[in-house]
Amino acid sequence: MNPGYSSTASQPGHNPSALPHDVHHALPAIGHPGSYHASMPQLPSIPPSMPPHYSDQYGMMQQPQDQPAPSSTTEGGAETKPSADAVARTQKKLQPHVGEQDGRKYRLDVVQQPKRARMCGFGDKDRRPITPPPCIRLIVTDAVTGKEIDCNEIEHTMYVLNVDLWSEDAQQEVNLVRHTSATPSISSTTPASFAQIDSTPPAFAQIPGTNREMPSYPQSQAYAPSVTPFAQQGGYGQQAISPVGPHYGMVANTYGGQGGYTYASPTDMHPHQLGSQVGPYGPRIFNGAPDMGMHQRMALQGTHQGAPPQGMFTRNLIGSLSASAFRLNDPQEKIGIWFVLQDLSVRTEGIFRLRFSYVNVGAPTRTPNGGPANQTSILNTGKAPILASCFSDAFQVYSAKKFPGVCESTPLSKCFAGQGIKIPIRKAEGGGKNNDDDDDY
């Protein structure tokens, strides 16, 4: 017998002959160790081309850190490139948007592309920005002649650039991240978008602290009038129920003047109670915490059968997500209108892209019919169209252990820092023990 193999028959207390007759025949026959090994379920073997750090996360594979392009692995270990259709969709999505307004065309040019960053997790104490800082130049041309308009003739004080975080293939917005478990671990998160929250089924409750109204089933029925602790004190307004369609009754919480909304299931109330709450019976109402802000938002979990687990939603891209325009000189002493995004960080690791959208929040000079607008304010109080948008190159966000360090300060960053833009500039090599922390503004 193999010394590394011991059967249960040789152990005390496990002699098959001492067992009852029917139990003895019900036991599986113990044969050669090779046959026992062959009867055990075999786990899938790890492909030979898989990096070593995959061994502990097999089945939850992520994109290799040294491969910027998305790829998949076949059973034989060979890597396959994205299909032609996927590449075509990505190329189509990456096409910049050029808008036109008042006889001028607007286009964005990402002169300084982001390259890498270190993930900051869910703490903001040791947050590192994306390096080098993205620098975007706004190019304004005449719609008829196509010539670039002089920057001195452009009033840029109301120009704003917004930034979003997108996936590597530019097909999905990943501005949010959600915990997939009860513990707030950065390794158990999935990216999400605002559109996915808006399409959440009624089983999942609202996101407190926002104007997005999400329906929610109450956790249980209550045969008592619904009264909040604030209403018992008599210091706040009572709750009024107004009908919202044939299926839900909306309950407005008037605490503090903040519009938190919850929804009650129609199964917990009679049809005549949809319009108003009458009688001693009413649905149990759960009011979201009014002091929860946009930074960390909790999705309240439904309790009906089939509801997948919900967790906390928080922003994946943090920092200054918008920037004003500046008239700056580049290293070649050419003046232009620039947007500098020097304070952007990503919570999770992966490969991402940034999408930049330019809007003019100033009051329109012309009406939609083409006539002169009555400018009573310098600020646009209505809707402002996106006049130009574009994507950045793909950049990689590393974990703290794999982060190779911040990029060297570029001549463009040093040039803008000399003109008053707050860009972190690294000191000369040898000036400090840890170059990653030797950043000046």
Curated annotation (Swiss-Prot):
GO terms for cellular component: cytoplasm; nucleus. One of its GO terms (biological process) is sporulation resulting in formation of a cellular spore. Residues 100-426 form the Velvet domain. Residues 1-14, 60-75 have a biased composition (Polar residues). Keywords: Cytoplasm, Nucleus, Sporulation, Transcription, Transcription regulation. It is found in: Nucleus; Cytoplasm. It holds the Pfam family Velvet. Disruption phenotype: Leads to reduced formation of conidia. Residues 1-104 are annotated as: Disordered. Component of the heterotrimeric velvet complex composed of LAEA, VEA and VELB; VEA acting as a bridging protein between LAEA and VELB. Forms a heterodimeric complex with VOSA; the formation of the VELB-VOSA complex is light-dependent. Component of the velvet transcription factor complex that controls sexual/asexual developmental ratio in response to light, promoting sexual development in the darkness while stimulating asexual sporulation under illumination. The velvet complex acts as a global regulator for secondary metabolite gene expression. Component of the VELB-VOSA heterodimeric complex that plays a dual role in activating genes associated with spore maturation and repressing certain development-associated genes. Belongs to the velvet family. VelB subfamily. This is Velvet complex subunit B. It comes from Pyricularia oryzae (strain 70-15 / ATCC MYA-4617 / FGSC 8958) (Rice blast fungus). The gene is VELB.
